[in-house]
């Protein structure tokens, strides 16, 4: 068997495995909003179908199995089924893995003036793990 045929057979055998590995790393749910800034956020699958019937004032994309969401001025985290896994008790929250932290840690703030920039507001700040 010459080298050309060997490479064809090898790429035919490995390509499906590589493509499925790449597809598995893509997010399965997406935070979406229709229209202007006053419309609620919701989550869809990759085909645009509504994933669950929860709507949020703001929503971030999933990082692993958690997404940061805001409802009625408080921030918390949901899992991929839409269940609240970290209660809506923070005045601001970042996504897991944001601001240079690894994907197991997120920054949250309490006692924050809502008219200020969250990252630079002097107020009680904490790092939480995926369970809050």
For each predicted feature, which ranges?
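Residue-level detector of conserved, function-critical positions
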Residues: 23-132
């Amino acid at each position: 068997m010459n080298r050309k045929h060997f490479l064809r057979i090898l790429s035919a055998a490995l390509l499906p495995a590589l493509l499925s590995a790449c597809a598995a790393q893509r997010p399965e749910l997406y935070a979406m909003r229709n229209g202007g800034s006053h419309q609620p956020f919701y989550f869809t699958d990759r085909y645009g179908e509504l994933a669950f019937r929860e709507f949020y004032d703001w929503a971030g994309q999933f990082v692993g199995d958690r997404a940061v969401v805001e409802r009625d001025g408080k921030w918390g985290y949901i899992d991929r089924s839409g269940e609240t896994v970290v209660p809506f008790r923070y005045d601001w929250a970042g996504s897991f893995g944001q601001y240079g932290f690894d994907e197991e840690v997120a920054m949250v703030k309490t006692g924050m003036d809502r008219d200020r920039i969250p990252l630079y507001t002097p107020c009680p700040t904490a790092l939480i793990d995926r369970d809050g």
